Amino acid sequence: MYKTGILNSDISKLLSDLGHTDEIMIADCGLPIPNGVKKIDLALDFGKPSFLDVFHIVKSHMAIEKMTLASEMKTENESLYNVLKEEEIKFTTESHELLKQHSKHVKAIIRTGEAKPYANVILASDVLF
């Protein structure tokens, strides 16, 4: 058993296997998961665990080059948008429909219990050297 770090074995393995520019997604409980994409389901109840709880834990263990958000987040979930834009990570936005199409190409989607709209982010892995 790990003394520190991510205890969820699926997430730990996912992060260990990432190469430069590989992408993962952290999603709210309503995002449709595309066929063929690995789903790591953490959702226990509405809001539990929250998007931000999962995001901050993953961020502390992953080298992130950039993140992609739904452009609708800026107006439909402004509080989350404001938190994410303050992170020291480059980010781009695309429509929610494009983000759902983009999700077909990620290595895995980590499903949270978040029940607020547009609480989804695609994280592209960076390289440490």
From Swiss-Prot:
Regions that span the bilayer: none
Pfam families: RbsD_FucU
Compartment(s) where it occurs, according to its Swiss-Prot or TrEMBL record: Cytoplasm
GO cellular component: cytosol
Gene Ontology BP terms: D-ribose catabolic process
Reaction(s) catalysed (UniProt annotation): beta-D-ribopyranose = beta-D-ribofuranose
Binding, substrate: D28, H96, Y118, A119, N120
Xref: InterPro entries: D-ribose_pyranase, RbsD-like_sf, RbsD_FucU
Signal sequence, start to end: none
Top enzyme category: isomerase
Keyword Isomerase applies: yes
Entry keyword set: Carbohydrate metabolism, Cytoplasm, Isomerase
Active-site residues, Swiss-Prot/TrEMBL: H20 (proton donor)
Pathway: Carbohydrate metabolism; D-ribose degradation; D-ribose 5-phosphate from beta-D-ribopyranose: step 1/2
EC number per UniProt: 5.4.99.62
UniProt GO MF annotations: D-ribose pyranase activity; intramolecular lyase activity; monosaccharide binding
Classification via PANTHER family: D-RIBOSE PYRANASE
Subunit structure as annotated in this protein's UniProt entry: Homodecamer.
Role this protein plays: Catalyzes the interconversion of beta-pyran and beta-furan forms of D-ribose.
Protein family membership: Belongs to the RbsD / FucU family. RbsD subfamily.
This protein's name: D-ribose pyranase
Organism listed in the record: Staphylococcus saprophyticus subsp. saprophyticus (strain ATCC 15305 / DSM 20229 / NCIMB 8711 / NCTC 7292 / S-41)
Taxonomic classification: Bacteria, Bacillati, Bacillota, Bacilli, Bacillales
Name of the gene this protein is made from: rbsD
